[in-house]
Amino acid sequence: MFVKICGITSIDTAQAVVDANADMIGFVFAPSKRQLSTSLAEEIANTLPQTIQKVGVFVDEPLENILSIIERVNLDIVQLHGDESIDYQKRIPIPIIKAFPATTEGLNQANQSSAKYILIDSPPLQSSRGGNGVTFNWNILKDQPFTSKLILAGGLNTENIREAIKTVNPAGVDVSSGVETNGKKDAKKIQQFITNVQRKDVLR
């Protein structure tokens, strides 16, 4: 099971993510309190080992902007949280994580997606998509056809991650606010989160 730590905005935090042996690191390019510039993402990316995959998070971004950022930051994966069309997705040259809300409609759309990974997140709060620290009923994900490529997100933290994994058994988990203290990434929480994910007693 892999772990993605999202919303990285500094070299120090990126190093904490690397030290904790996360599998993926997420840069948010969409409007958000965790949004960072392409220049800063490029600077951080240049410090990372090849063992960690760099994920760029976008919401209905013009395709040419994504293609430019992929090249500048050397992204490994693109994560899409908007209403991007199938044709749009086909023009992205690297693997895609397609995010869907944990709703009946969202799950129906997820089942039709050909993206490499399906990320299921809590339904958006007002205009915010992702990173809101709110959980949802994980039981709705049991026995979904896309479980083998499912990334679970939405309100995960060091306290609930073991129960989440036992319930859903996803391919990966994605956390942002759940490893923060006072709105800032907390190295100890990052390490504890990953330790809890890796504990053998969480697996079915």
From Swiss-Prot:
Documented EC number(s): 5.3.1.24
InterPro entries: Aldolase_TIM, PRAI_dom, RibuloseP-bd_barrel, TrpF_fam
Sorted UniProt keywords: Amino-acid biosynthesis, Aromatic amino acid biosynthesis, Isomerase, Tryptophan biosynthesis
Disulfide feature: none
UniProt xrefs under SUPFAM superfamilies: Ribulose-phoshate binding barrel
Biological-process GO terms, alphabetical: L-tryptophan biosynthetic process
GO function term, MF aspect, one: phosphoribosylanthranilate isomerase activity
Record keyword Nucleotide-binding present: no
Superkingdom to which the source organism belongs: Bacteria
Pathway: Amino-acid biosynthesis; L-tryptophan biosynthesis; L-tryptophan from chorismate: step 3/5
UniProt KW Cell membrane keyword: no
Class of enzymatic activity (EC top level): isomerase
Reaction catalyzed: N-(5-phospho-beta-D-ribosyl)anthranilate = 1-(2-carboxyphenylamino)-1-deoxy-D-ribulose 5-phosphate
PANTHER family: N-(5'-PHOSPHORIBOSYL)ANTHRANILATE ISOMERASE
NCBIfam families: PRK01222.1-7, PRK01222.2-2
Similarity remark: Belongs to the TrpF family.
Protein name: N-(5'-phosphoribosyl)anthranilate isomerase
UniProt organism field: Oceanobacillus iheyensis (strain DSM 14371 / CIP 107618 / JCM 11309 / KCTC 3954 / HTE831)
